[in-house]
A protein has these predicted regions:
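A shared catalytic/ligand-binding motif for oxyanion handling
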Residues: 1-259
Length: 259
């Protein structure tokens, strides 16, 4: 299964619409989550009305010219059931066509508030989106220092829900203010969080930052195979590796060596 998430910062521009369609053709995601569409669900459906493959769409309408959250999925490859809609979260059960294994999927825009966290029970979850929050100062370069209280609250939510923060193999920052020199600010605002019970299997999993020239956020792609056999995996992915502070450095080193 391939899932991408992207804060596109508005889809009224024809140029952004063309670029998004090109990304869909290139990346071929089964599921795509889009934040800040800044348009209505109906307009989003009109934009993709003649696009092939024909993606199904569920969305929160933008409020005026702000906000908007959408999930697109290819019904020939993925089945969705039991939609839950909250102000900043869209979630559903999903599975690959032909598979008997359901995974709960949630697209997020902004850090979940305490009441919204109740949708993350002790079940297999893949949570993705623009959380607009970092877990530590190492995830930000430049700009005003985030408060420890906010970062700790976000980290506590991840730990309490037994989610694992998946690192991207080709970089850290997913947002940049597009300014140079000492005025540049970059942060890791977008991410995939996956339940430990999903991670602690013999699976293939990889997250990567993609090009995204029409927004100040970059798209992120997650590739996950819940049924990968031992022959397909040279080792078992363990959740506790991601709690090692040196893990990100190791991953970046492996990535460079593979080039």
């Amino acid at each position: 299964m391939i899932i991408t998430t992207w804060n596109i910062r508005g889809m009224n521009s024809k140029g952004k619409q063309r670029y998004l369609k090109e990304r869909l053709r290139r990346d071929k995601p089964n599921i795509m989550i889009i934040q800040e569409t800044k348009i209505s669900e109906q307009k989003l459906k009109d934009i993709f009305g003649k696009f092939k493959p024909h993606y199904k769409i569920i969305a929160h309408d933008a409020i005026g010219s702000a906000g908007g959250l959408a999930i697109l999925w290819n019904p020939e490859e993925v089945q969705f059931e039991d939609l839950v809609s909250l102000p900043r979260i869209l979630s559903s059960k999903s599975r690959n066509i032909g598979s008997q294994e359901w995974v709960l999927l949630a697209g997020v825009y902004g850090p979940p508030i305490p009441g919204e966290r109740k949708i993350f029970p002790d079940k297999p979850w893949i949570v993705e989106g623009d959380f607009n929050m970092i877990t530590s100062l190492s995830e930000q370069r430049g700009g005003l220092r985030r408060t420890n209280t906010d970062m700790e609250a976000f980290g506590d939510m991840i730990n309490e829900q037994r989610l694992v923060d998946i690192p991207t193999i080709n970089g850290t920052h997913t947002w940049n203010n597009r300014r140079g020199g000492t005025h540049q600010i970059a942060s890791r605002l977008d991410r995939f969080l996956i339940s430990e019970q999903v991670i602690n299997r013999d699976i293939f999993i990889e997250a990567m930052i993609l090009p995204g020239m029409v927004s100040d956020h970059w798209p992120i792609k997650l590739e996950i195979d819940l049924k990968a056999s031992p022959k397909m995996r040279p080792f078992r992915f363990e959740a506790f590796w991601l709690r090692d502070q040196k893990f990100m450095t190791k991953v970046k080193g492996w990535w460079r060596q593979s080039q």
